[in-house]
Each structure stands twice: as C-alpha cells, then as structure tokens.
C-alpha cells in the first residue's frame, strides 16, 4: 500500500536556518506516522533551473506549462500529495522572492479551472503553514498568509489558520533551549496537520 505523500515547502533562502530546522522536524514527524515526505526548497528550485512565470498563458491555451523544468515536477508531486505544509520566514511583511516566484507558477493549476477541467479531488486536501519572524513586524502577517492560502486553494488544498512564530532573531533560534516552548507549538501544528492528512486518506 502506498504511503500518503506530504510535500513540505521550505520557503527560506537559508539552508540551515529556523525554517530548515522546522522542515526537518516535519519530515521526521511525517516519517514516524507512516507518511512519505519530501522537502522542497523554493530557493533551490527557483535558482537552479526553475523559471518564473512569464505570463505567456500557454497553460491556458494548451493545458501545459511552456517550461519543462523542476517546477513541472512539483506540479506532479502536488497532484499526488495528500497534504501540503508551508514553512516560510517573513520578508518585508511578505514571503521571500524565491517562494513568491514558485507560487506564481501555480498559474498552471488556475489554468485547469479556466479550461473547465474537473477537479481531481472531491474534498480539498489538508494544508498547514508555519510562519517564522525575527520580530514583531508592524504590518502583521496577512501578506504572508494570503499568497499561501491562494496557492493552496488553487492546487486543491485547504489551508488551516497558519501558526506564527515570532521573536526568532537568530538563524538557529528555534533550536535553543529558551525557545523550546515555541518549537513545541510548531510540533503541535505539525502533529495536527499529519492527523488531518491521515484522516483525509481514510
């Protein structure tokens, strides 16, 4: 029997920071619960051959993206997934540019609806998000949550209310003993998310 697949999108350009640590925690939690998990680094994806959307609308007219790159492999992965977990830092009250470029490529999923294609799933699959900040941005996290919600929705996932973790000022802050409580909050979000994935799988 195939295991449920969980896609973990790591949105930070840092490969060894707080988001990367939480992505590894999520990977291990999924594995422990009998799920297959894959960590997708948006930064690596979009700086090692992934193209930003150029607005050509080839996906609308033909049903396929004009680019044949690793992002098209992500489409296939998301179509096969039972859950989607976003983990991203806050950059100027929004998401990092590499993650936004990846999200813009979700136009492919929007084109399916534009072309009148039938949704692949009767019920939306679960999605969750961990949003990591180094301070209390006076502009809040709405500009982070909206693109994650929109992208999840168009790819046939239902994003639950994101968990926001603030005051993580250093790249390794989430691993420090004084932030153990915050890490546990993240772990609880991950556990709840995996519960939802397994429930969706039935």
What is each of the regions a protein language model found here?
Residues 24, 95, 117, 146-148, ...:
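Alpha-helix termini
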């Amino acid at each position: 029997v195939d295991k449920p697949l969980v896609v973990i999108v790591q949105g930070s350009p840092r490969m060894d920071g707080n988001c990367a640590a939480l992505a590894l925690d999520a990977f291990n939690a999924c594995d422990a619960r009998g799920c297959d998990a894959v960590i997708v680094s948006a930064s690596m994806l979009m700086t090692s051959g992934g193209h930003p959307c150029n607005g050509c609308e080839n996906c609308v007219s033909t049903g396929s993206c004009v680019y044949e790159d690793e992002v098209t492999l992500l489409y296939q992965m998301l179509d096969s997934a039972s859950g989607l977990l976003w983990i991203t830092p806050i950059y100027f009250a929004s998401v990092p540019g590499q993650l936004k470029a990846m999200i813009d490529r979700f136009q492919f999923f929007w084109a399916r609806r534009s072309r009148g294609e039938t949704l692949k799933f009767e019920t939306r699959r679960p999605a969750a998000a961990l949003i990591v900040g180094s301070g209390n941005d006076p502009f809040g996290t709405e500009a982070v949550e909206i693109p994650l919600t929109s992208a999840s929705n168009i790819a046939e996932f239902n994003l639950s209310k994101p968990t926001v973790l603030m005051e993580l000022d250093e790249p390794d802050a989430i691993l420090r003993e004084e932030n153990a409580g915050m890490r546990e909050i993240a772990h609880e979000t991950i556990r709840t998310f995996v519960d939802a994935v397994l429930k969706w799988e039935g």
